[in-house]
């Protein structure tokens, strides 16, 4: 497999808080050594990402990213949790200042480490200012329902993993004698590009964000063409930080 995603929520205390075992003990000490072994034995031409999650319980998530790097994981990603506000761990609009502060803090440390030759990759700070992806990827970055599908253990087909269980978006089953993905659904996803979304059309970040997550738009706004606001604001901050890192590398690098 060309790419694997290794899911570990963050530092030991962060991971064990969100991911206890069935006997209510922490899972970090079970999982982390296995991930390290996989990475150490993985061919250099194959990719991996260690993927964490930040919630209201670890808004200091820059520490989780640096923890991954210090543990030897050089390809990292830490994603914001997505959940309804009544969930105690869900992010809220009032958390944005702290989230922005953490991205800025991480960006400075990230750039400094790269300049010292001890760098690593953080998925959300990877940006190509010279060329970047093709125009199709720029206007609709999510391939759900067309380039990407999720298959459940029972064989049900959905546009992506976030739609699993939503019967309105069930596309079929791999055990069906003939599989024809419903055009009304696949076309809806295909047509949900940045020029079809009022909030995106005049946004400075649209060609780096590419319209955001379709599932979040539907789950929070019941409309695939109305982006998830918290996601938009965090993506703008990540782009700003990515540009700052590029500028710092150009000005201070060799």
Regions from the PLM with identified roles:
Residues 98-131, 162-210:
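C-terminal accessory region of radical SAM enzymes
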Residues 1-81:
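Radical SAM/AdoMet-radical enzyme domain recognition
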Residues 13-18, 75-97, 119-133, 158, ...:
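Flexible glycine/acidic-rich beta-alpha junction loops that bind and position SAM and/or redox cofactors
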Residues 14, 21-32, 44-51, 84-121:
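Short acidic, glycine/proline-enriched helix-loop-strand junctions
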Residues 142-145:
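Short, small/polar residue-rich loop motifs at catalytic or cofactor-binding pockets
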Residues 53, 133-134:
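Basic/polar, acidic-poor N-terminal "presequence/leader" segments
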Residues 154, 159, 195-254:
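Radical SAM enzyme core and accessory elements
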């Amino acid at each position: 497999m060309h790419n694997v995603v290794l899911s570990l929520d963050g530092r030991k205390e962060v991971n064990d808080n969100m991911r206890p075992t069935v006997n209510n003990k922490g899972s970090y000490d079970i999982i982390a050594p296995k991930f390290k072994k996989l990475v150490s034995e993985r061919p250099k031409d194959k990719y991996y990402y260690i993927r964490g999650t930040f919630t209201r319980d670890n808004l200091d998530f820059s520490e989780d990213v640096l923890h991954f790097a210090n543990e030897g994981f050089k390809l990292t990603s830490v994603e914001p949790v997505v959940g309804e506000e009544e969930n105690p761990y869900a992010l809220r609009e009032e958390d944005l200042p702290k989230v922005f502060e953490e991205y800025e803090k991480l960006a400075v440390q990230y750039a400094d480490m790269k300049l010292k030759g001890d760098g690593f990759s953080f998925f959300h700070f990877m940006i190509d200012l010279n060329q970047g992806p093709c125009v199709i990827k720029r206007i609709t970055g999510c391939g759900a329902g067309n380039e990407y599908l999720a298959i459940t253990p029972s064989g049900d087909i959905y546009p992506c993993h976030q739609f699993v269980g939503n019967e309105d978006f069930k596309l079929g089953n791999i055990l069906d004698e003939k599989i024809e993905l419903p055009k009304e659904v696949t076309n809806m996803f295909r047509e949900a590009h940045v020029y079809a979304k009022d909030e995106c059309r005049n946004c400075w970040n649209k060609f780096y964000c590419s319209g955001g997550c379709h599932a979040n738009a539907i789950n929070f706004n019941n409309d695939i063409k109305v982006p998830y606001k918290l996601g938009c604001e965090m993506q703008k901050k990540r782009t700003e930080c990515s540009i700052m890192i590029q500028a710092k590398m150009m000005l201070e690098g060799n």
